[in-house]
Swiss-Prot record:
GO terms for cellular component: cytoplasm. This is Pantothenate kinase. Its EC number is 2.7.1.33. Belongs to the prokaryotic pantothenate kinase family. The lineage of its organism: Bacteria, Pseudomonadati, Pseudomonadota, Gammaproteobacteria, Enterobacterales.
Amino acid sequence: MSIKEQTLMTPYLQFDRNQWAAQRDSVPMTLSEDEIARLKGINEDLSLEEVAEIYLPLSRLLNFYISSNLRRQAVLEQFLGTNGQRIPYIISIAGSVAVGKSTTARVLQALLSRWPEHRRVELITTDGFLHPNQVLKERGLMKKKGFPESYDMHRLVKFVSDLKSGVPNVTAPVYSHLIYDVIPDGDKTVVQPDILILEGLNVLQSGMDYPHDPHHVFVSDFVDFSIYVDAPEDLLQTWYINRFLKFREGAFTDPDSYFHNYAKLTKEEAIKTAMTLWKEINWLNLKQNILPTRERASLILTKSANHAVEEVRLRK
């Protein structure tokens, strides 16, 4: 089989950076450099150019999909003779720890909310749906945080199911990275958004990952468009270690931080600790649970050095 034939058989359209940037068309930049600086993560270089060449074309594509979805809802309402409920369009963002999912989510939230339609965009991270530390300790799962079994999947699925069912007020638990735990009584109420962005490690999992439980319902069953943020493993490890070092000098210095003791480490000790955490927890989770879901995404953003997206793959 020729390379051309193999290319034609892929379920994805592939764009290099320049090809993707051309899809921006005439969409105006709606974010200032100061706003972009506030949106980026602790260890990322997010430039005006990156937003213009990668995220503006993506927001344009998503706006087309969302408008199409609304038209389809209107057809159903016309057929049934009903007044429509506000059913949000759900976008999920998956990928490894340290790949930049949160930044992608925040940028898309800002861009999508500034389209002329003025749609209301909510952002929820699945961290809030982790079991509280007390439960994880009882189950021996503290070193498995972020693995599928560490989440209250029933509550997470009910959350997205309620939103898709038109429930007007839905609550989501909130996670604090300072205390490394779910905030007691800190729930956030989500009130009928037009768009919900759901960001998390395992949001692309499906029944294929649980063949022993074929009747399981998953978050992915309710998602309209899914994004996987990808990068080579060596870069992910480097980004994770660099982020850990920055936390050591910043967030970890807070006496209330769960990881306050890490602030006392020397740089060499901190690098060694970060590498151990990466290999024993985050790399393992990536290989076992996250990476196998990549090819299910509607769109894959592949990053190179400096968190710059070098390739985009869009499912046909």
